[in-house]
UniProtKB/Swiss-Prot annotation:
The gene is CRYAA. Belongs to the small heat shock protein (HSP20) family. The modification Phosphoserine is found at S45, S122. InterPro entries: A-crystallin/Hsp20_dom (IPR002068), Alpha-crystallin/HSP_16 (IPR055269), Alpha-crystallin/sHSP_animal (IPR001436), Alpha-crystallin_N (IPR003090), HSP20-like_chaperone (IPR008978). The lineage of its organism: Eukaryota, Metazoa, Chordata, Craniata, Vertebrata. This is Alpha-crystallin A chain. GO terms for molecular function: metal ion binding; structural constituent of eye lens; unfolded protein binding. Residues 153-167 have a biased composition (Basic and acidic residues). Acetylation at Lys-70 may increase chaperone activity. Undergoes age-dependent proteolytical cleavage at the C-terminus. Keywords: Acetylation, Chaperone, Cytoplasm, Eye lens protein, Glycoprotein, Metal-binding, Methylation, Nucleus, Phosphoprotein, Zinc. Contributes to the transparency and refractive index of the lens. Acts as a chaperone, preventing aggregation of various proteins under a wide range of stress conditions. Required for the correct formation of lens intermediate filaments as part of a complex composed of BFSP1, BFSP2 and CRYAA. Residues 52-162 form the sHSP domain. Zn(2+) 1 binds at H100, E102. It comes from Equus caballus. Heteromer composed of three CRYAA and one CRYAB subunits. Inter-subunit bridging via zinc ions enhances stability, which is crucial as there is no protein turn over in the lens. Can also form homodimers and homotetramers (dimers of dimers) which serve as the building blocks of homooligomers. Within homooligomers, the zinc-binding motif is created from residues of 3 different molecules. His-100 and Glu-102 from one molecule are ligands of the zinc ion, and His-107 and His-154 residues from additional molecules complete the site with tetrahedral coordination geometry. Residues 144-173 are annotated as: Disordered.
């Protein structure tokens, strides 16, 4: 017999006023004013609305671009050093894995780990792939595309991650 577990009536009635960040990807990074009191911005001015979302690339969400000449992945890895990252190519996939052990930050101790997997286009030259992390923590994985009919060189191999000294970001669309 399944029993539905529900919040107490007062939490259901006031649901919009309770922050729910348990499954948010920003969990553990601290609370913002709008997390605690989201109704304040609308009561102060009906036309003022605090943004509930951070920029896409600041949130750890990746951006993939595939144009005529090249294939590029941009990924925010600001919490990881190049030594914490592993990038490898297997068949038609690139796997990016980041892991750092427990360390202290502003809110206590934290350890992080992520695993991303992307399908490479069949015409990407896998012998010319490169990966770097900019000074501001933006990982850029790229590879040129080859003309149709040429061998793209599919095999498993690790891609070294280099560090750039200048800040980098994804070009705007």
């Amino acid at each position: 017999m399944d029993i539905a577990i529900q919040h107490p009536w007062f939490k259901r009635a006031l649901g919009p006023f309770y922050p729910s960040r348990l499954f948010d990807q920003f969990f553990g990074e601290g609370l913002f004013e709008y997390d605690l009191l989201p109704f304040l911005s609308s009561t102060i001015s009906p036309y003022y609305r605090q943004s509930l979302f951070r920029t896409v690339l600041d949130s750890g969400i990746s951006e993939v671009r595939s144009d005529r000449d090249k294939f590029v992945i941009f990924l925010d890895v600001k919490h990881f050093s190049p030594e914490d990252l592993t990038v490898k190519v297997q068949e038609d996939f690139v796997e990016i894995h980041g892991k750092h052990n427990e360390r202290q930050d502003d809110h206590g101790y934290i350890s992080r780990e992520f695993h991303r997997r992307y399908r490479l286009p069949s015409n990407v030259d896998q012998t010319a792939l490169s990966c770097s992390v900019s000074a501001d923590g933006m990982l850029t994985f790229s590879g040129p595309k080859i003309p149709s009919g040429m061998d793209a060189g599919h095999s498993e191999r690790a891609i070294p991650v280099s560090r750039e000294e200048k800040p980098g970001s994804a070009p705007s669309s």
